[in-house]
Structure formats: C-alpha cells, structure tokens
Amino acid sequence: MLSRSDRSAVEEVQIDGELCAIIISAEYDDLGIQFFTPNEFSQQIASMSYPSGKVIPAHTHNPVRREVFYTQEALFIRKGRLRVDFYSQEQEYRTSRVLSAGDVVLLIRGGHGFEVLQDLNMVEVKQGPYAGDMDKTRFSAVLPPKLKFD
C-alpha cells in the first residue's frame, strides 16, 4: 500500500469507471519493492529501490503458460516531454496527461494517442509476439478545442 506522501507520485487514470493507465512520476521514491498492478494483469509493473550492498538472489523464471487478450504497454520517458491523450474503448476522448523525463506510464485499456511536446526518447515494453495489424485498431483522434487535464 502506498503511503500518503507517495500517492501524488502515482496516478491511476480511470475512464468510465475502469483503470486505463497507471502513471509513475519521476518523483516517486520508496525503498523496497512496490507493485502498482494487481496480480491478474498480464503486464506487471513495480518500483524496486535498494541501498548499496543489497543482494538480490540469483534466479531464473520458470516456463508458465499464460493467455493474453489485450496488449498492455509500458512507456519509459528517458528524455523530453510527451502528451498522452486517453480515449474510451469506444474511441471517445476523455482526458490528457503530460509526461516528462523519468516518468513511466502503463497503458492498460482503452485508446491512446500521443503528441511529442519536446524532443523525445522513450522505451516501450509490451507483450509479444507482435500480432501486426491484428494488434490494434487505428482511429481518427477527435480532440476537443480545449484538452482536459483532470
């Protein structure tokens, strides 16, 4: 569970009562392991922070068959600024957020679009194998005259 001081550094973006994204601000800083996703998500995201000298035991991961129905992707902003526009599953604009260097977003469900606000370098992580055109439905972004940042 996040402490009160950490809550502002981690935001859950809800659309129509469903969790569509988790944003972890560059300011988030807590010792130990903090998972931000429930166990049933097909993409897990956690913060791990330890003092110098901490030993993490060597390990391998066992083969476990999993079924993935939706692609969930994590974006790690290394440099620059990126606006993320969030859409409902019905492709209707709902809200936007601006990410900066050091921020991380896990895109869970719903639609999303992006505008690069400052020269950007980011890393994307998502499940594979890539399904090509079957993996996504592209749509025309209909943005309101004034974006929402609630």
Which sequence ranges carry the predicted segments?
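Short acidic-glycine-tyrosine-enriched beta hairpin
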Residues: S88-R109
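A short, N-terminal "cap"/entry segment at the start of jelly-roll beta-barrel domains
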Residues: M1-S47, V142, F149-D150
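Short beta-strand His + acidic residue motifs that chelate non-heme Fe in jelly-roll/DSBH
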Residues: A58, V84-D85, V105-L107, H112-L117, ...
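Double-stranded beta-helix
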Residues: G113-D150
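Conserved short histidine dyad/triad with adjacent acidic residue
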Residues: S47-F69
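Short, surface-exposed beta-strand-loop junctions and turns on beta-sheet-rich folds
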Residues: V64-R65, E90-E92, N121, P129-A131
